[in-house]
Amino acid sequence: IEDSAQTDEQKNALRTRADEIFRTLIDTDVIEIEQEDGRDYYYTTVDLPQDFALDQPLSPFLIAALELLDPASPSYALDVISMAEATLEDPKQILRAQERQARDKAMEEMKADGVDYDERLDRLQDITYPKPLNDLLTEAFDQYRKDVPWANDYWINPKSVVRDMVETASDFNGYIARYNAARSEGTLLRYLSDAYRVLARTVPPEKRNEELDDIIAW
């Protein structure tokens, strides 16, 4: 912060936010304080990646929320991915493509079932892109915002892009083709880069299993 090219006012704001994030890591028991010889010493309570980074504003929430998952669950690796994705900025073009495809599929199914036109239109309003763990994450974040006031500046956005690619065994080109999103290649590439950084550099090793490590390497 001190060496950055920000104005004094911006540096003060960054210092305040850094203090708030550090306090959050202490409150969530990621960091603990021990006093010795009249000095404070700070230690992490969990193993963190060598290049550990809080790349996203809600990375501290992600670390806390991982405690809600059952490592023995068959969907554990995918659920960790969903929690990470919820803290990322939305790749809006990709999500719109997902929603459009979901609505097109629903429309065809309703036509086949003989649902009348007006009813089909009403039902389509409730169809959107996939949002794994939406209820769990929304409830957890509501509580988190009560305990961490600065988090009120942000909101989680559950979505399934990386998870969707894994579940459908889609590579980059195949995924772009499936959603007819050739004009959104840059958006998808940036999103996947952000997702990789969060999974590789923020999720503690102890919260990763072999399946998740394989996905990150992929």
Task: Annotate each PLM feature.
Residues I1-W218:
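Non-catalytic terminal extensions of ATP-dependent helicases
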